[in-house]
Amino acid sequence: MTSVEQSRQLVTEIPGPVSLELAKRLNAAVPRGVGVTLPVFVTRAAGGVIEDVDGNRLIDLGSGIAVTTIGNSSPRVVDAVRAQVADFTHTCFIITPYEEYVAVTEQLNRITPGSGEKRSVLFNSGAEAVENSIKVARSYTRKPAVVAFDHAYHGRTNLTMALTAKSMPYKSGFGPFAPEIYRAPLSYPYRDGLLNKDLATDGKLAGARAINVIEKQVGADDLAAVIIEPIQGEGGFIVPAEGFLATLLDWCRKNNVMFIADEVQTGFARTGAMFACEHDGIVPDLICTAKGIADGLPLAAVTGRAEIMNAPHVSGLGGTFGGNPVACAAALATITTIENDGLIQRAQQIERLITDRLLRLQDADDRIGDVRGRGAMIAVELVKSGTAEPDPELTEKVATAAHATGVIILTCGMFGNIIRLLPPLTISDELLAEGLDILSRILGDF
């Protein structure tokens, strides 16, 4: 089993010479459309550290975009995967089923919000889960249209690109896109507050604004679903004002519109709850999950009320690899680890550690326009000094400097001015503090 010392160590520049040679091979074999944030080639990873081919150890504050939530190569996952691979690796569940798939769906039906009878279906990726949630919603309502939100990200397939708000790099040049997609304004407290202070704090008011746009653009009679990330991911870790999600859900319930929660990035303890919609006390009709579900193995799911999930005809849902038994074994071990090791509570601790530090930084630096997020999903919105104008150039400089110092951080946001922190929940306090020290020092240097 992988054992990686939980400390940062730089023995070469980042990236090192071996990584640079491998990057040449990458560029000769992989199309340029597959962009790479930091070309250090990984050999081992565990806890909060990634080790590269040059022997450097980097602090991981990205978790592979919120995937290795319980830490890379988590012991229970390694044991479960080894055992499953030794038994069988694939049969195709829709041809000859197996217990592992059923066990995962049982667990999802148990842990997702809501106490009624539920059903779950498994896929390979978040985008595939989102696509299928729309299929289910359309099948149940017999209506075509879907509403997504400003700043949304839902994937890179044709339909999910249509749902995604940001053009470059996700959509530019790839159209035409799926029809019957409409867009509504999100509750974005930081930027809403620049225009209307009430919008920043009153989620019901922000919800009414969104509903007004929805009713004018498409109307309930043709609307199958509203899909929303309870906390936006790629859009900038935007946490809507309290009451926004509940207002939307109430409108959906009154109008036979499915409320779909895209919890691909927020699910599985990432935000200090098993699912982010729990913070708002809402129960979606359908919930999409992926990323943190299986500690790095490809798995995704759609879970929802049984009557809704049973709407598609027999063989209307499925796929060759969806619910692969090895990925299912990893998912079962992941859920056990979250629940047995107190990782929901750990995410809450990480939130306090990060936000306390970042809020102190904000007090001393007016380029930090906003600090937001929940759990181990925290963002810093960088702006030009004395303004609220996004500063993507500073954001890129900070990220590049962090990488060179051995700290993996990610950027995001419609304007490219968000530093996002997504550490694994198993990172030590000391390692997290070191990463934040480095981030603080870099901001001071610029």
Swiss-Prot record:
Q: Which CDD domains match?
A: OAT_like (cd00610)
Which EC class heads this enzyme's classification?
transferase
Listed GO biological process terms: gamma-aminobutyric acid catabolic process
Cite the entry's keywords alphabetically: Aminotransferase, Pyridoxal phosphate, Transferase
Statement: the UniProt record of this protein carries the keyword Acyltransferase? no
Question: Of which family is this protein a member?
Answer: Belongs to the class-III pyridoxal-phosphate-dependent aminotransferase family.
Question: What is the name of the protein in this document?
Answer: 4-aminobutyrate aminotransferase
Give the gene name.
gabT
